[in-house]
């Protein structure tokens, strides 16, 4: 019954597809292979540079591309969703059987194993994306089962799985390492059978042979090293990349943190009990528990190894029950374990947010625009609809740079069109190319050389997150350059075209007065009323389009300009009419509304809006001061005192806040 509950919960967790942009690459790669009848090894996905020689492209994920392209032709995105679910369920079913074997005859361990399986599933759920790493996860999960039930049949089953794995993902290297660990002599006191090591050695031979026979072959290790070298170069220039962001550990509120905490405790228990110190179980757990602290992306890899390891720990803690009969207390323990996992990690068992890109090569309708999408989804759709972006420079949400490919179109009546793709594969670039792309952001001369060599005609830029963001200086360089014209912007991105672009003459759509790019890098709005009026007029025209009407950030800029002119009534009229979801911009808009109502002495409305804007993690001294004034006017003196404390914590020398604090203290308000 407990295993049935775990299986149902895992099946529910596989519902809903979050399409990563990597799917576009694998569709393209698989389509090229099927069309050409061979595996391409040319580095043709990136902007060519005349002084950088092309590099051999190992294409070690070629088979995954073929499978994804075939499935997509058969069932579209629903087929890819099904493929994703099958890989995830297969992986954790392997892990479940391995956990059952590891639990042995201990009734407590067998009843707790489903809860541990769900915990591992919940911890890994952040990586349930339709990408080749799911093949690696399924392969590694199969290995956790085979090493615990070695035999010739297992080796025979591993042969096709290894060939599939080696041609789908580079992390077959993890499988080889895992199999090698199981060659370590067992000194735990619970020795494996004498001939088990022979089968483990056979597993290593099968995996290594499969990797050597893949198109990547001997390049696999070099590819991994190239990836980390690219990461080092990025970090040195101040960028970050989610692919190598280490997991932060907090021992509460997270299924992955709980999984890691339990695994550490189990390893330490085995270490200090001495008799279980050096054995494959402990060494493999110790090796794979480190991976999430290198990159949080590896939590799914660690989960499939740690869950079977943990499944045997209850039997080791209570060795007297190892051969006992199951009792109601064991069932209660298992039910409570499952309930705890479902309670503390329920979101992973519900359909995730579906962020599916529009069918490739087809103009997206106006209602497909999603202002709240990830950078730079909407910008790419704008470029595609207008036939732009042939020579594009930008980066994606991970800090990687844009490449190109001919995108297959889901509608047979539409011809394939060239469309940008966000390349997450630094290892496919020559070192010089990576370095030139990155230096172009921080060095003006390097940027001019790169833009000339690659004939770049389009730029997509993200909004800089803070003053130290490397893109901030690049944005300043582009925003004040006569060579580039701002033609489109939304809540996540700014789009520029070269001033010589024919599209500018044909469409004539540019932003000359409404320039949020310049306002961001200078922190200065237009000085004259005439300039502010011109900027407002441009933004109003932009908001009249289906796309512009969904951009929330434009409301912020318009409200700022109106408040600078002292027009509180127009600000309220503008913002109160908003009926769309404001997402991450809600606090900012609430702050504008609160200030506007305060200027009209409508203190209750001002207090309500400012209280929302000042919720954590707000850190604006002016916002807290405005909230304190509104609270005091509404006679919420305790709230006013708290807001003043937060204000002075941000800026201890804020003179008006100090005056208000003295006034409240003189009135005998508690807290001063």
Where do the protein language model's features map onto the residues?
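Transmembrane-helix motifs of polytopic, lipid-linked glycan transferases
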Residues: 82-104
